[in-house]
C-alpha cells in the first residue's frame, strides 16, 4: 500500500520553542505591546499568532518608544543593536538561540586573538548579519566553493572558520573541504556549528529518501533550514516542494505513484504539519501513515533570566 512517511524529528527545535515562549511569557508578565527586533522566528503562522497577542515586530529600534521592552529574535543581533538599545534606554530581552550565541562567542574570541574569520553562510541572512557584526573588519563571508577559491589569504595566515547554524550539511561539507584544501592550518570549533536540530532534521530526511519519490517540506519560504531540507531531497534526485499552508498541497501530487515523505523546518508549528497531512489524505484517501524515528530529541533551553 502507498504510504506517507513522516520524519521524526521535525518542526520546532529547542531554540525556537524558547524564542516563542520568551515573547508569550513577556506578554503575560508585562502586557501588550512587546516589541520584537525582526520576526522572532521565520514562520508567518508563528508571527501572526504572536502579533494577535500583542507583539509588534520591527526592524529599526527607532520604532520602539524609549524605556520600552524589546526582544531580540532567535537569530541574534550584532553588538551595534545592543548598544543602540542601551543608548535609547530600552529594556532588552535576548531570545537569541544558545547555539547562535556560541558562534558569536567563538568569533569574538578568535578575532581578539588576531585570526581572520571565514564565515560560511548566506550573507543576507539575519543570523550572518548578526555574527558578522562582532568583528566586521576581520570576517569574510563565503557562500560557495567559488568564493573560497577567490579568498586572498595565504596558507600561513591565521584563519578560523565557522558556519551559519542552519546550513545544508552537504553544502557546508563541500565548502569546508575546499577551505581545508587551500588552508590546511585553518582552525574551527571542536564540534560543528551547524546546530543539532538542523543536523537531525536533515539526517531524518536523508534516511527516508530511498523509500519515497516526492517530499513535502512544511515551512516558510523565509526559513533557511526549511529551504535547506528541500535542497537535501532535490540533491538526491527526489522531487520536493516547500509549502506553508494546506492550500499549497495540490493535485500535483496525483502525478506521482510512490510513497510521499513529509518533514518540517525547525520553525514550523505541528498544527500546520497536521493540516497539510489532512489535505494530502483528502487528495489520496487510501494513504497509510508511517512514522520514521531518526533520533530522539530532549534538548531544552532555559528562558532569559528577565522572565
Swiss-Prot record:
(2E)-4-hydroxy-3-methylbut-2-enyl diphosphate binds at residues 42, 75, 125, 165, 223-225, 267. GO terms for cellular component: cytosol. InterPro entries: LytB/IspH (IPR003451). Its cofactor is [4Fe-4S] cluster. The keyword 4Fe-4S applies. Keywords: 4Fe-4S, Iron, Iron-sulfur, Isoprene biosynthesis, Metal-binding, Oxidoreductase. One of its GO terms (molecular function) is metal ion binding. The active site is at residue 127. It catalyses: isopentenyl diphosphate + 2 oxidized [2Fe-2S]-[ferredoxin] + H2O = (2E)-4-hydroxy-3-methylbut-2-enyl diphosphate + 2 reduced [2Fe-2S]-[ferredoxin] + 2 H(+); dimethylallyl diphosphate + 2 oxidized [2Fe-2S]-[ferredoxin] + H2O = (2E)-4-hydroxy-3-methylbut-2-enyl diphosphate + 2 reduced [2Fe-2S]-[ferredoxin] + 2 H(+). Isopentenyl diphosphate binds at residues 42, 75, 125, 223-225, 267. HAMAP family: IspH (MF_00191). This is 4-hydroxy-3-methylbut-2-enyl diphosphate reductase. It comes from Chlamydia trachomatis serovar D (strain ATCC VR-885 / DSM 19411 / UW-3/Cx). The lineage of its organism: Bacteria, Pseudomonadati, Chlamydiota, Chlamydiia, Chlamydiales.
Amino acid at each position: 500500500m502507498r504510504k506517507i512517511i513522516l520524519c521524526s524529528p521535525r518542526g520546532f527545535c529547542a531554540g525556537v520553542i524558547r524564542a516563542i515562549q520568551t515573547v508569550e511569557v513577556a506578554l503575560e508578565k508585562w502586557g501588550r505591546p512587546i516589541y520584537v527586533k525582526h520576526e522572532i522566528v521565520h514562520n508567518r503562522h508563528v508571527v501572526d499568532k504572536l502579533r494577535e497577542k500583542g507583539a509588534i515586530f520591527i526592524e529599526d529600534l527607532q520604532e520602539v518608544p524609549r524605556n520600552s521592552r524589546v526582544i531580540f529574535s532567535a537569530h541574534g543581533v550584532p553588538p551595534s543593536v545592543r548598544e543602540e538599545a542601551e543608548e535609547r534606554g530600552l529594556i532588552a530581552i535576548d531570545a537569541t538561540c544558545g547555539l547562535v550565541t556560541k558562534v558569536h562567542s567563538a568569533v569574538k574570541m578568535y578575532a581578539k586573538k588576531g585570526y581572520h574569520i571565514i564565515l560560511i553562510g548566506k550573507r543576507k541572512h539575519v543570523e550572518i548579519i548578526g555574527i558578522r557584526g562582532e568583528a566586521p573588519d576581520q570576517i569574510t563571508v563565503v557562500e560557495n566553493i567559488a568564493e573560497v577559491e577567490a579568498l586572498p589569504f595565504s596558507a600561513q595566515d591565521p584563519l578560523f572558520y565557522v558556519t551559519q547554524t542552519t546550513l545544508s550539511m552537504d553544502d557546508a561539507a563541500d565548502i569546508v573541504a575546499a577551505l581545508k584544501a587551500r588552508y590546511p592550518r585553518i582552525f574551527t570549533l571542536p564540534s560543528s556549528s551547524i546546530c543539532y536540530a538542523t543536523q537531525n532534521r536533515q539526517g531524518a530526511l536523508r534516511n527516508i529518501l530511498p523509500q519515497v519519490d516526492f517530499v513535502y517540506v512544511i515551512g516558510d519560504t523565509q526559513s533557511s533550514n526549511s529551504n535547506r531540507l528541500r535542497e537535501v531531497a532535490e540533491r538526491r534526485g527526489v522531487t520536493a516542494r516547500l509549502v506553508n499552508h494546506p492550500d499549497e498541497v495540490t493535485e500535483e501530487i496525483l502525478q506521482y505513484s510512490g510513497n510521499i515523505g513529509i518533514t518540517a523546518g525547525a520553525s514550523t508549528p505541528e498544527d500546520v504539519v497536521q493540516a497539510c497531512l489532512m489535505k494530502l489524505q483528502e487528495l489520496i484517501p487510501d494513504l497509510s501513515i508511517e512514522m520514521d524515528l531518526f533520533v530522539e530529541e530532549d534538548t531544552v533551553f532555559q528562558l532569559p533570566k528577565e522572565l
